[in-house]
Regions:
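Conserved alpha-helical substructure of the radical SAM core
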Residues: 1-112, 122, 126-134, 138, ...
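C-terminal accessory region of radical SAM enzymes
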Residues: 138-141, 145-153, 174-202, 226-227, ...
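Conserved C-terminal portion of the radical SAM core fold
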Residues: 9, 13, 52-60, 81-88, ...
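Short cysteine clusters
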Residues: 18, 22-25, 210, 230-231, ...
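Hydrophobic pocket-lining residues within nucleotide cofactor-binding pockets
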Residues: 94-96, 159, 188-189, 243
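N-terminal [4Fe-4S]-dependent radical SAM core
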Residues: 1-11, 53, 199-207, 213-216, ...
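Alpha-helix N-cap/loop-to-helix initiation residues
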Residues: 67-68, 97, 162-165, 236
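Amphipathic alpha-helical recognition patches that constitute DNA-binding helices
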Residues: 1, 9, 13, 155, ...
Length: 292
C-alpha cells in the first residue's frame, strides 16, 4: 500500500444540491440540508494544489455542478491557477444553456460526462423525473456544436439497472455517435447500499482493497469542507477531517486516514463497514462489470 504525500485527484462539491431525482441515486432519500461551499474554502483547495503533483480536479461530487450560478467563474479560477491540471465534469445537462456552453468551451475541460439515462421521453422521465428531456437533448446538441472542435472528451453515460429496454441503449449510442460523443453503458452501483429502490445484493465481511484505488489516490471534499473517505459515503459516516481547519496534505497523510487505509488493504484487519457493502471492493467477483 503506497500513498503519495498529496492526492493525485481531488473531487469536491461547490454545493450539495441536485435536481434530477434519479431513481438509481441515493440523493432524494438523504434529506440533506442545502450547503454551499464558502469561497474561501474553494480557493484554499485550489491554491493548495499549486506546485503539487495533482493530475485531475473533479469539481462535482454527488451533485449537479451547474446549479451553482458561479460555476463557470470557479472553473476559470481553477484553470488560471492550474493551467495543466485535468478537469472532469459530470452533469445531467438540464441547467446548461448556449452561453454557458460557449464559456465552457473556452476553459480547456478535459472530460465532460453527460448523464442521460433514457433516450425516449418516457424512459428518461422514469429514470430522471426532475429533468426536462427536450432541454437536455437540445443542450447535448449545443455541446456537440461548441465543444466538438476542442480537445474535450465528451461522453454520454447510461446506467444499466436491468429495467431499461435494449432499444434505449441502441438509440442513445446512435445519438452519441452522430454528435461525436463517446457512449458509456455502465453497470448499476447501489452506492454501498445507499440506494433504496435497487440493490446489488452485496456484502463481503472479508473485503480487502478497492478496485478503483480511490483511498490511495483520490480525496473527496463536501461543500461544508468535510473530507469523506469515499464518494460512496452518501451518509457522511466516515469523516477524515475538514479543509476549513486543516490542509489537504495534513488530512491526506493523517493517522485517521491511514488507519482506514490499513484496515481496508490488510488481509487480517477488519475493513471499514462501507467497503464491505461496496461491489467495488477488490474481492468482489462482479466489479469488472461496473465502470464508475
Amino acid at each position: 500500500m503506497r500513498v503519495t504525500r498529496f492526492p493525485k485527484i481531488i473531487e469536491f462539491q461547490t454545493h450539495n444540491r441536485c435536481n434530477a431525482n434519479c431513481i438509481i441515486c441515493p440523493y432524494s432519500s438523504m434529506g440533506y440540508k442545502s450547503e454551499k461551499m464558502e469561497d474561501e474554502i474553494f480557493k484554499k483547495i485550489i491554491d493548495e494544489c499549486v506546485d503539487k503533483r495533482i493530475t485531475r480536479l473533479i469539481p462535482y461530487l454527488n451533485n449537479e455542478p451547474f446549479l451553482d450560478k458561479t460555476f463557470i467563474q470557479k472553473l476559470s479560477y481553477i484553470r488560471k491557477k492550474l493551467p495543466q491540471v485535468e478537469i472532469e465534469i459530470s452533469t445531467n445537462v438540464s441547467f446548461l444553456n448556449e452561453n454557458l456552453i460557449i464559456e465552457l468551451s473556452k476553459l480547456n475541460i478535459t472530460e465532460l460526462r453527460l448523464s442521460m439515462f433514457g433516450f425516449t421521453y418516457r424512459m428518461h422521465h422514469i429514470m430522471m423525473p426532475g429533468v426536462d428531456h427536450k432541454k437536455v437533448f437540445e443542450n447535448a446538441e449545443l455541446i456537440a456544436k461548441y465543444l466538438g472542435n476542442t480537445e474535450c472528451k465528451v461522453s454520454i453515460v447510461m446506467i444499466d439497472n436491468k429495467k431499461i429496454p435494449e432499444s434505449e441503449f441502441v438509440e442513445m449510442k446512435k445519438f452519441a455517435q452522430k454528435n461525436g460523443f463517446d457512449f458509456c453503458r455502465w453497470g448499476f452501483l447501489d452506492r454501498a447500499k445507499n440506494v433504496k429502490k435497487f440493490s446489488n445484493n452485496y456484502y463481503d465481511d472479508t473485503a480487502s482493497g478497492c478496485e478503483q484505488r480511490r483511498p490511495l489516490e483520490r480525496m473527496h471534499i463536501l461543500a461544508d469542507g468535510k473530507v469523506i473517505f469515499c464518494c460512496q459515503d452518501w451518509a457522511h459516516e466516515n469523516i477524515m477531517g475538514n479543509i476549513g481547519t486543516d490542509t489537504i496534505e495534513s488530512i491526506w497523510v493523517s493517522e485517521r486516514y491511514n488507519n482506514y487505509r490499513k484496515c481496508l488493504y490488510s488481509a487480517t484487519l477488519d475493513a471499514p463497514e462501507i467497503c464491505k457493502r461496496c461491489v467495488l471492493s477488490e474481492s468482489c467477483g462482479i466489479n469488472g462489470k461496473i465502470c464508475n
